[in-house]
Amino acid sequence: MSQIQTAPLPVMPSQAAAAADAAASRWKVADVAALYELPFNDLLFRAQQVHREHFDANTVQLSTLLSIKTGGCEEDCAYCPQSVHHETGLKAEKLMEVEEVLAAARVAKENGATRFCMGAAWRNPKDRHLEPIKDMIRGVKSMGLETCVTLGMLEAHQAQALREAGLDYYNHNLDTSPEFYGQIISTRTYQDRLDTLEHVRDAGINVCCGGIVGLGESRRERAGLIAQLANMEPYPESVPINNLVQVEGTPLTGTEALDPFEFVRTIAVARITMPRAMVRLSAGREQMDEALQAMCFLAGANSIFYGDQLLTTSNPQAEADRKLLARLGIRAEAAQQMPAERECSHGCEGH
């Protein structure tokens, strides 16, 4: 089995630095749309310049995502096969046992991941659900892995409980722009999402927040999503950019596929508007050829989800990823002591 070259973990930006970025530029949707309109080469050149100011351009973080509770979600997100509103043939499952999750985390670490994400298909977790999840967080952190969970909407006290368990990141995506949002989901408002993100931020947990493109939105609406993310104060430390994976039985089956260059443009625009964020090349990567993935790295993506599965959709084989990164001369960040090597963006002394 080929080996991936490793590089030291980057230190995440401080809150002061991210706030300075936000103060320097409040992004209007029109300004973000203007970035999209740049000639492709000019846009990528600018994004790569910004990327090199803040990161090693030849290093990516390998993340692994595990569905710890699959299906049965009450939300009606039009893209999601885990919704009870859609007939996708997906069977709802109970929350995994703690030791099962920790075993998967050990394998992820052995395969080179430095970040382990856990996702549960809930509208919002009950307090009793958090007890085993806190054990999962503690166990994964004890392995030296960065931790992230996505559990749906949170109340303030729940976010604080996760923070006390040592959680590094909470993922809660905006999905799309405020203007297009009503076309995608009706069971949760945009403000609901923003409220959860506020609870996460107030608890001192790093924010992981991005969206999905290829939902049928316009370029202007894609610009609206990026502007919404970039204007958070501070903007998210982690920004996953997903390309719609169409699943039979969901309302978005048959949606016209997004132009591949438009996806690369979205990565580049995210990098320019959120220069210190980890921009994560997320769902939809299996449908991308190697040249397209390479362009995404050039545009500023510096993290991939690594492993054969992303929640309920497939992902490129790990060995294929190893070979691609080696051919591109890209190193995976090295597993080092966590979380000391990655600074909390809120000035806390460790999670």
Swiss-Prot record:
GO terms for molecular function: 2 iron, 2 sulfur cluster binding; 4 iron, 4 sulfur cluster binding; biotin synthase activity; iron ion binding. Residues 58-285 form the Radical SAM core domain. Binds 1 [4Fe-4S] cluster. The cluster is coordinated with 3 cysteines and an exchangeable S-adenosyl-L-methionine. Binds 1 [2Fe-2S] cluster. The cluster is coordinated with 3 cysteines and 1 arginine. [4Fe-4S] cluster binds at residues 73, 77, 80. GO terms for biological process: biotin biosynthetic process. The keyword Acetylation does not apply. It is an enzyme of class 2 (transferase). Its EC number is 2.8.1.6. SMART domains: BATS (SM00876), Elp3 (SM00729). NCBIfam families: bioB. Homodimer. This is Biotin synthase. It comes from Paraburkholderia phymatum (strain DSM 17167 / CIP 108236 / LMG 21445 / STM815) (Burkholderia phymatum).
